[in-house]
Amino acid sequence: MGLLATGEKSHLEVVRTAIRELDWAKPDVKLTLGPEGSAWAYGYQNILLCEYYLRTKDDYVLPAINKYAVTLAKGRDAAGLWGHRMANPEANRGQLHGRLYGYAVMNSSSLPCYISLLLAQKCGVKDPELSAAIEQGRTFYGSFVGKGTLPYGVHDPNTKAFNNNGMSGMAAIALSLAEDKQGSAFFSKMSLASTNMMETGHTGHFFNQLWTGLGAGLAGPSATTAFFKETAWLHTLNRKWDGGFTYDSGEDYSYSGFNDAASHLLNYCVPRHQLYINGKDADKSIFLSAAAAQQIAGLATLDVKKLSEDELFKLLDHEMPKVRQEAVWQLRGRPHKYVNDIVKMLTNGTALQRKSAVEYFGYQCPPDQASLAVESMAALLKDSKQEMSMRADIASSIANLGAGAHAYYPDILKLVLEKKPEDKLGEIDMELGRALVTMCADPYAAGLVKDKELFYAAANKLMAHKRSYGRATGVKMISAVPLEDFHWVADSVKTIMDDQDLTYTSYHNFEPKIEAVGIYARLNIEGGIEGALAAFDSDTGKAGFKIRMLMSVLPVYGANAKYILPKVKEINPGKFKGQWDKIIADIETADPVAAKKMLKFEEAKNFGKTK
């Protein structure tokens, strides 16, 4: 890849010969969706083959490109993403796009897969699965634009950094290839602003140093110059006497055996624009001027603690989420004259100022300041002319008032039930669900379950959320549901307990199931422990997560769990052995009198109906 990036014809024959010697590049290469199919390998291998074809038009690699593209497209999960491996139909009741092995989605492995699919499309590959995968990826990665860098998997945007182990650079390239100008511009700037964190990264910084410079280069020559001005030392200090490069990392599992020379060469060749990952045919309309590039690069060392209140106030309109957030927290932590101006921003500010103002009066805002904005925020919360995303942000902020905001609990329930065609990933509903749980942990005790039809309709909708964090908010809302009301939510709780829905777009987190089992245990309903144990029968899901889930469940049942201990003892708890053994011992010694008669699910479901 590095040799291709030079654009020098003398290197093309070397690359051509090398590719023909690679088993994984042969026309008859065998790929699989099974456990042996590696998303890491398939994604990067396909990028090389595609870039090689687009540079040389050598038809030899087209059969392999077609196989990689279709296999990857078929191997994506319901979110359109990948983990260490593919979503194997054999582990998902024969269905495509089911659940991934282990702890599921990782953006660090998914982004190269997605980039390779976009390149394969440029190579002429056509397949319905490929088209669907590209559209899903565009929606998912586009959802982070303007909000933060990429997280580990299907999580919230990371607003505390400009970059996360090269993922801002990868996202810039992916969205450039997907013709998302706004997204490419945003993430190329995020990459340019992260020059001070080039030696950071989960299990090592290899991907950071590979991709970040490539992403920054999409912002044009001035951005490339500014980036290399700040990072040239890295290349120099890693250079060896023989012209190669070292990979220096003290991290465990830090990509041993990787060729770091190729990473440095690809970055050195950014100005040549010979590869698509190096900015070939990049959109020049997003190129930064020299002054703008210097300003963005300077954000890497911005210390908001040294800024005046006036300077911090101006940053509430900054395009970078990290800068705005730091300005909010720093300004709020000092005595200043701008509180009333920030209240006015809620209604009269720019889009970014309004977002900053909502955050200012949210989490950990001093009550004396937050109280000044309640009336304005409540009016916006109820205003149907406001964007739904803004109303959800306001719900999140106002929820931090706790009991002081209970009057708005029904308004948020109604927002959950409103149709939101723009909320393709359910992010707005998830935020509203979190607001409800933050505002009141037990709405029954607080007297907030007045309109049962409204309350349970919102809870049921959230429990059907495709993301685990969304489902968890729905179950938490009803964690104290009385038996006479169980029929309102019984089917939703059972669906979460059974956990068989392969259309979930996040499923690694067992929090919804733990909450559901808690309801079963509190209402003395049979099947809770069996539901928890069923997770161990699935090939997907991380074993450690399953063990921790079961350790949360068993103590809730206490003496009622004695009958299941023989099965529990068959499980190897690994590093959790100490806690595991104590839980088992506590159950074995529990007073038998404490055991209660269990209700069958249908009995519990019908209890309230028959009263």
Regions found by a protein language model. Name each.
Residues 79, 90-209, 219, 226, ...:
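Extended ligand-binding clefts on enzyme/binding-domain cores
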Residues 180-189, 215-218, 222-318, 581-611:
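Terminal, non-catalytic domain-edge segments
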Residues 1-2, 174, 217-218, 295-304, ...:
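Structural detector for internal amphipathic alpha-helices that build alpha-solenoid repeat scaffolds
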Residues 12, 278-279, 305-315, 335-347, ...:
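Amphipathic alpha-helical scaffolding segments comprising HEAT/armadillo-like alpha-solenoid repeats
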Residues 1-4, 38-51, 105-118, 163-176, ...:
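Well-ordered alpha-helical segments within folded domains of soluble proteins
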Residues 3-17, 52-69, 118-138, 175-190, ...:
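Structural helix-adjacent loops and short alpha-helical linkers that scaffold large soluble proteins
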Residues 13-31, 64-82, 132-150, 179-200, ...:
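Long, well-ordered core segments of solenoidal/helical folds
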Residues 38, 106, 319-320, 349-350, ...:
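Short inter-helical turns and helix N-cap capping residues of alpha-solenoid HEAT/ARM repeat scaffolds
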